[in-house]
């Protein structure tokens, strides 16, 4: 299957699951393919046939954008260079959860979250330590007796009851002994932080020299500016403790600029984020819901409220 066909399938699946899905980010380079929202759940989705193509730079940008846009970065893919991705298993690449389309279908359409995740050494599951301790005590088994049944140490059983995750083989033996409901699903929409050590959000990249004049104005009027490298916009600006967010792009007002402005409008609608595109000269005030602002107008803005007023008449204001 081609990547384009796979993106279409995943996008259709998200729509069937009740998500509002943005236009595809048909620009290069691009850190994500679509943004999607269902209620309070927002995802930034990258779709790949071979997930080995997902590099560290893209992973870092998706994680940054997830933080700034209050979204979960996810990758859906079919395989690695060596093998297909197993259904029902969450993998990780550069801190981003990865799974195959069948797992995505179960999660988003059927409401069945995955139970298994891949980590160095094999496949693992979340063990509900409190339930395990209760079941062991109900069966009047000591830590040592259960350890003998499982072929592990007494200390390891104690760690399972304290919340340590177990290999899938141990989990299957536990369920043979005590029945089901010992395992807890992987919380994919929270970035699967329950099953992995969470690294801090990667640092922002340096702004490209040609972006500095526009981004410095946003910083001057009170926005915390986060430059991007691979997104269809140049930066995400935050003001008011992150409640006032702004996707920002700039270039000459060409057909390519209109295309980017449309994508920014669509992503902004899904993520409840305002979008502005800065140009030298323009014969219009908006492209869809992306405000078009001339550089001279932007230079005359005094503060974030002044900028908000300027944008209010140009496209619909997306509320965070």
Curated annotation (Swiss-Prot):
It holds the Pfam family HTH_3. This is Putative HTH-type transcriptional regulatory protein VNG_2112C. Keywords: DNA-binding, Transcription, Transcription regulation. HAMAP family: HTH_type_cro_C1. PROSITE patterns: HTH_CROC1. Residues 132-189 form the HTH cro/C1-type domain. InterPro entries: Arc_TR_HTH, Cro/C1-type_HTH, Lambda_DNA-bd_dom_sf. Residues 143-162 bind DNA. One of its GO terms (molecular function) is DNA-binding transcription factor activity. SMART domains: HTH_XRE.
